[in-house]
Amino acid sequence: MSTKKIMLKSSDGKMFEIEEETARQCQTIAHMIEAECTDNVIPVSNVTSEILEMVIEYCNKHHVDAANPCSDEDLKKWDKEFMEKDQYTIFHLMNAAYDLHIKSLLALAYQTVADMVNDNKWAFE
């Protein structure tokens, strides 16, 4: 069975093809699909290609189906490694998760920042 694909366009114009079911993890995109207000391309105007690529990677990993079995322990380990990024990137991932309404990524980003603050690894400038 082939899955429906949609195209996402980042703020800097780069195009990404993603499975619709994976994209539905982004509540903003899911609402656009349900309201049929998408042509062939969904603009993601507040997210650069660099960050959108990471968001898609996260959504692909967290997309649950028979083809993607993953234990909770494996997923937690993957999440921890995924968030090993600089403050700038974490901040932009957090904003993208907020704009796209990806609750699990937003919670992960918030927890990462809280852990960094508690461990004195967050630079306040």
Curated annotation (Swiss-Prot):
Any single Pfam family the record assigns to this protein: Skp1_POZ
Domain of life the protein comes from: Eukaryota
Biological or metabolic pathway of the protein: Protein modification; protein ubiquitination
Residues forming coiled coils: none
Gene Ontology cellular-component annotations: nucleus; SCF ubiquitin ligase complex
InterPro entries: SKP1 (IPR016897), SKP1-like (IPR001232), SKP1-like_dim_sf (IPR036296), SKP1/BTB/POZ_sf (IPR011333), Skp1_comp_POZ (IPR016073)
Tissues with expression: Restricted to siliques.
Chain intervals for the UniProt region annotation (Interaction with the F-box domain of F-box proteins): 94-125
Subcellular location: Nucleus
Keywords: Nucleus, Ubl conjugation pathway
GO BP annotation list: auxin-activated signaling pathway; jasmonic acid mediated signaling pathway; protein ubiquitination; response to auxin; response to jasmonic acid; ubiquitin-dependent protein catabolic process
Recorded family membership: Belongs to the SKP1 family.
Biological role: Involved in ubiquitination and subsequent proteasomal degradation of target proteins. Together with CUL1, RBX1 and a F-box protein, it forms a SCF E3 ubiquitin ligase complex. The functional specificity of this complex depends on the type of F-box protein. In the SCF complex, it serves as an adapter that links the F-box protein to CUL1.
PANTHER family found in the cross-reference section: SKP1
Subunit structure: Part of a SCF (SKP1-cullin-F-box) protein ligase complex.
Protein name (record): SKP1-like protein 7
Organism: Arabidopsis thaliana
Gene name per UniProt: ASK7
